[in-house]
Regions:
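Rossmann-like dinucleotide-binding cores of NAD(P)H-dependent redox enzymes
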Residues: 47-48, 140-142, 148-204, 284-290, ...
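Beta1-alpha1 glycine-rich phosphate/pyrophosphate-binding loop at the start
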Residues: 1-63, 148, 155-178
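Mid-to-C-terminal Rossmann-like scaffold of FAD/NAD(P)H-dependent oxidoreductases
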Residues: 270-380
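Hydrophobic Val/Ile/Leu positions in short beta-strands of Rossmann-like dinucleotide-binding domains
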Residues: 19, 119, 143-144
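A Rossmann-like FAD-binding core segment of flavoenzymes
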Residues: 14-16, 56-84, 90-91, 159-253, ...
Length: 380
């Protein structure tokens, strides 16, 4: 949303731009939370790309604690609720850009309302997690979900001296993000720093007011704190009946990122952008993807018919796991198979520098390539 506002104000001289944010903080980057929790970024307010004044100094308006609750296409208005006093007003628009984002999933199991069951998304949770990492009373930490967020959380608490158990339904940490050869490289590091319980089903949480253990189909896991990172769902319930959604709640857009409602566009984590290697829309919840979408929409927002469609994205991201640093682009074994594509992989290992350089200054480099064996298209 902020990227759209900045781009609009930079590109056009005669636009009135207003940003509404339901939360009390603008543009918190959850992907940077690990840096804050490890004290590499000293202030939680610094974990963001934009501040309200970045928009305001260009002539725009930013309202935090203001939730857009409804769209009225026939009048080209939205209902805005001021969450500080519960007052509402109708606001006119000529063009509307939706960037409503996603909400972390809460596991629908008994005990999910116990204290000390945390999520890892947003500024408020960052503060709670920082307190927990420094709390000597919290000794056993269970992380539910072994994707990017879960592995980041497991590293934070392991470095804080906690006994960490990382668990997931999948058979290996990061199993949906990296090819198997890279997982082979990483797995010993995970096992050295924490307990792994892979291929387990979470059946509930046990405790008396506060969580004491995680109930799984393979036994209970002691936990003074549980961090749940079990995926996300689009924040789109408020759009039902007005904006077309798919069966899972993602906003449907055409190739120009327009919704079914005239002059209403959608960008960000709540849509399914075109994946170039997959050749179809798929979830790619990355800030870089959203920024490309925002730039495209702003470039064409006043055209009756854009002269080109949104070209799509590859989906590139990076992750550090203890002493390893990974970057990925496109599809891997898991996502290629999920999209029913023909694929093979190739793995290469070498040192960064010539062999005569001492080992301490000559780290290993690992490359895993996913490709279509028939067309030779590189998938990721």
């Amino acid at each position: 949303g902020h990227e759209s506002a900045i781009e609009l104000l930079d590109k056009y001289n005669d636009v009135d731009v207003t940003v509404y944010e339901a939360g009390d903080f603008i543009s918190f980057m959850s992907c940077g939370m690990q840096l804050y929790l490890e004290n590499k970024v000293t202030a939680e307010d610094d974990v963001r790309n934009f501040a309200p004044e970045d928009v305001e100094k260009k002539g725009g308006h930013v309202y935090a604690n203001h939730e857009v609750t409804a769209i009225h296409p026939e009048n080209k208005t939205v209902t805005v609720k001021d969450l500080t006093n519960n007052s509402e007003e109708e606001v006119q628009y000529d063009r509307l850009i939706l960037s409503s984002g996603v909400t972390p999933k809460v596991l629908p199991v008994p005990g999910n309302d116990l204290k000390n069951i945390y999520l890892m998304r947003g500024r408020d949770w960052a503060s709670k997690l920082m307190s927990a990492a420094n709390d000597p009373a919290i000794k056993n930490v269970a992380i539910v979900g072994a994707g990017y967020i879960g592995t980041e959380a497991s590293e934070v608490f392991a470095k804080a001296g906690k006994h960490v158990t990382l668990m997931d339904m999948i058979d290996r940490p990061l199993g949906t993000y990296l090819n198997s050869e890279l997982l082979d490289v990483l797995e010993p590091t995970f096992k050295k720093n924490m307990d792994l319980k892979m291929g387990v089903k979470i059946e509930g949480f046990n405790g008396n007011g506060k969580v004491e253990s995680v109930k799984t189909d393979q036994g209970d896991v002691p936990a003074d704190l549980v961090v749940v990172s079990a995926g996300v769902m689009p924040n789109t319930d408020w759009l039902k009946g007005v904006v077309d959604l798919d069966q899972r709640g993602w906003i449907k857009t055409d190739p120009y990122l327009r919704t079914n409602v005239k002059d209403v566009y959608a960008i960000g984590d709540a849509i399914l952008p075109l994946s170039i290697p997959a050749g179809k829309p798929m979830p790619i919840a990355l800030a870089t993807t959203t920024r490309r979408e925002a730039q495209y929409v702003v470039d064409h927002i006043f055209e009756d018919k854009p002269d080109r469609a949104f070209k799509g994205v590859i989906g590139a991201s990076a992750l550090s796991v203890f002493d390893y640093h990974f970057a990925t682009a496109g599809l891997n074994q898991f996502s290629a198979a999920k999209n029913k594509l023909d694929y093979q992989t190739s793995f290469y290992e070498d040192n960064m520098r010539p062999a005569y350089v001492p080992e301490a200054d000559n780290p290993k480099v690992y490359v895993s390539l996913t490709f279509n064996p028939y067309t030779h298209q590189i998938l990721g």
